[in-house]
Amino acid sequence: LGKLLSKQTNEFYICHNYGINGETSSDLLRRSWGILKSNKGSAKICLLLIGTNDTKKPTPLSIYEDNLIQIIQSIQANGMIPIVGTLPLLTFSPYYAKNRNWTTKYNKVIKNLSEHLNFDICLMDNMEEYLIDGVHFTHEGYNEMAKRWSKKILALK
């Protein structure tokens, strides 16, 4: 993403990825303040894509919503602009077979919160073709995701 933004703008971008494999929104909430505080003043934008792992053993909608509220308000309190990605729809995976519809439920939460907390959404719709195992992206999928994030970031100008 940093390379793509630099190429498009002739400016220097550094992108940090603080994602942890298997992490839920509750896990991220526990460590988010420290991450955000350590980047206060240097990071201007915070991209957030969280919730796919919440579908494995579905996190209740009220808890997912509360986790997002706290994370997004922490982003804003640390002077950063939040952009939240919608969750890509999952295709077949044994681990998620019974809970794939939860991504749609979580996306409704994201869309509702965007109006109340005043943040932009980056749509990750129609990404199914890029899933290698029904859940995780191929290299091309991550490149497509970077293109979508970059368009949303550059639209802030």
Q: Across the structure, where does each feature detected by a protein language model lie?
A:
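A short beta-strand-loop structural module common to alpha/beta enzyme folds
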Residues: Q8-T24
